[in-house]
From Swiss-Prot:
UniProt key word Mitochondrion: yes
Compartments reported by the entry: Mitochondrion matrix
Domain of life assignment: Eukaryota
Keywords for this protein: Apoptosis, ATP-binding, Kinase, Mitochondrion, Nucleotide-binding, Phosphoprotein, RNA-binding, Serine/threonine-protein kinase, Transferase
Protein name: Fas-activated serine/threonine kinase
Statement: the UniProt record of this protein carries the keyword RNA-binding: yes
Role according to the record: Phosphorylates the splicing regulator TIA1, thereby promoting the inclusion of FAS exon 6, which leads to an mRNA encoding a pro-apoptotic form of the receptor. Required for the biogenesis of some mitochondrial-encoded mRNAs, specifically stabilizes ND6 (NADH dehydrogenase complex subunit 6) mRNA, and regulates its levels.
Subunit structure and binding partners: Interacts with TIA1; the interactions leads to TIA1 phosphorylation. Interacts with TIAR.
Organism this protein belongs to: Mus musculus (Mouse)
Length: 511
């Protein structure tokens, strides 16, 4: 024991730390396990003074062992503290005191069951400072008593094993989707049993893919297959959520029964939930797969009269206006009813929500400043909405010779519906003094694409497709090229090269 206490582990600096511990007071140690606690003066406090004034370890042991009726739990920390002070002043105790230290240790071990929790903690702390080994009998006994006083841990609730569809649902319900990469989702889906893939789980998967722009073919094909297999059990409100990622991610599934299945569901459910029906058609519009029969139903007077006055009336009319535009531009063979003119509303009268939410990350202000310095503020329009309601990033009017024309002298809008036959176009050119070309600069920001790919989102591809069919010339500005421009001079040079590639020229007539 002496060798342990005087080893390198018990350095003078460590023992001197005992001097910084304030004297242990009975009132701060709390009641002992048996509930006794000294009050006031008397033999108990007299014994504490004797311990504090002891001149050797033997004297400490004598006061503790010869006064069993007066010794209380708080006296043992006092004795340990005094022992440390004596070891500092007498670094080499005599061989007789080695046995004394062992006896003192055994005395504490025998009586520690009566210590309160606070006394046990103080004794543990002092014993460590004195250098008692961690695997020695004193520290082991004190540590065992400390653990026995801890409140019992509540039994952990039984967590059943999570398999297949349940694990997929847990992953999809987590707000931090990056914790669950697509490989995890694919594996969970592959391990799921057919009965575990409920509509709720598949809707969560579809919403997850659409929200985070994950164009993952394996997962999308699984949704398409589920829709075909469960066709009879699904209503239009569930189907609209299942088909959402296909339109948003511009992905046409390989499942051959996908479109026939949707046409049957639309025929069965079209009059039940008008908004769900139109939402399904919106997704199919982005895929360029509009079924004529469903269009005839939603453009019928009975359907339009049914939605008027209902809460979703405005949003349904906006979607119907977009569907009517798609019929006009993309379905020349359609002969059914169309949306009446009085029911039409602007499709997208302002920048999309995602663009407004991420405006501080957009390159639009930078491009606008470059165009202002390159062309002049009067020679372009920003955020101009053209019929039938598409918001353009930047619009220019260019003469047949390639000169950029001032916007104040031009009508920025092309006629809608566009003139389709050559005779109408010839009549238009002969009666119009300004055959200027309308050029739309399209910003393609990072969030306009599916994640980790070069496929435009369905709504972006639809807008560009319709503007092109209406006669506007499109000039895409990809985010990779914009991000590589360092400073305004480089950006102006980049824009000049882009415009010159379309036949623009700078001279007396233009910018």
């Amino acid at each position: 024991m002496l060798r342990i206490l005087l080893s390198a582990q018990t350095s003078p600096a460590r023992l001197s730390g005992l001097l910084l511990i304030p004297p242990v007071q009975p009132c701060c140690l709390g009641p002992s396990k048996s509930g006794d606690r000294p009050f006031g003066g008397g033999p108990v406090q007299g014994l504490q003074r004797l311990l504090e004034q002891a001149r050797s370890p033997g004297e400490l042991l004598r006061w503790l062992s010869q006064n069993p009726t007066k010794v209380r739990a708080h006296h043992y920390p006092v004795a340990l503290r005094r022992l440390g002070q004596l070891l500092v002043s007498q670094p080499r105790p005599s061989p007789v005191e080695q046995a004394t230290l062992q006896d003192l240790s055994q005395l504490i071990i025998r009586n520690c069951p009566s210590f309160d929790v606070h006394t046990i903690h103080v004794c543990l702390h002092l014993a460590v400072l004195l250098g008692f080994p961690s695997d020695g009998p004193l520290l082991c006994a004190l540590e065992q008593e400390r653990r026995s006083r801890l409140p019992p841990k509540p039994p952990s609730p039984h967590r059943p094993a999570i398999y297949g569809g349940q694990r997929l649902e847990v992953a999809l319900s987590c707000p931090r989707f990056l914790q669950y990469p697509r490989q995890h989702l694919i594996r969970s889906l592959a391990e799921a049993r057919p009965e575990e893939l409920t509509p709720h789980v598949m809707v969560l998967l579809a919403q997850h893919l659409a929200r985070h722009r994950l164009r993952e073919p394996q997962l999308l094909e699984a949704i398409a297959h589920f829709l075909v297999v469960q066709e009879a059990q699904l209503n239009s409100k569930v189907v609209q959520k299942l088909v959402l990622p296909f339109g948003r991610l511009n992905y046409m599934p390989l499942e051959q029964q996908f479109m026939p299945c949707l046409e049957r569901i639309l025929a069965r459910e079209a009059g039940v939930a008008p908004l769900a029906t139109v939402n399904i058609l919106m997704s199919l519009c982005q895929l360029q797969c509009l079924p004529f029969r469903a269009l005839q139903f939603v453009f019928s007077p009975s359907f339009i009269n049914h939605i008027n006055g209902t809460p979703p009336s405005l949003i349904v009319r906006r979607y119907l206006s977009l569907l009517d535009t798609a019929v006009e531009l993309e379905l020349p063979g359609y002969q059914g009813p169309r949306l009446p003119q009085r029911q039409r509303v602007p499709i997208f009268p302002q920048p999309l929500i995602t663009d407004r939410a991420r405006c501080k990350y957009s390159h639009k202000d930078m491009v606008a400043e470059g165009l202002r310095q390159l062309l002049g503020e009067e020679n372009y329009r920003q955020n101009l909405t053209v019929p039938p309601g598409y918001c353009t990033d930047f619009l220019l009017c260019v003469s047949s010779s390639g000169a950029v024309l001032p916007m104040r002298t031009q009508d920025p809008f092309l006629p809608y519906p566009p003139r389709s036959c050559q005779q109408d176009q010839a009549n238009f050119n002969s009666t119009t003094q300004d055959p200027a070309q309308r050029v739309v600069l399209m910003l393609r920001e990072r969030w306009h694409f599916c994640r980790d790919g070069r496929v435009l989102l369905g709504s972006r591809a639809l807008r560009e497709r319709h503007l092109g069919l209406m006669g506007y010339q499109l000039l895409p500005l990809p985010f990779e090229e914009l991000e590589s421009q360092r400073g305004l001079p480089q950006l102006k040079s980049y824009l000049r090269q882009k415009l010159q590639a379309l036949g623009f020229r700078w001279g007396p007539e233009g910018g």
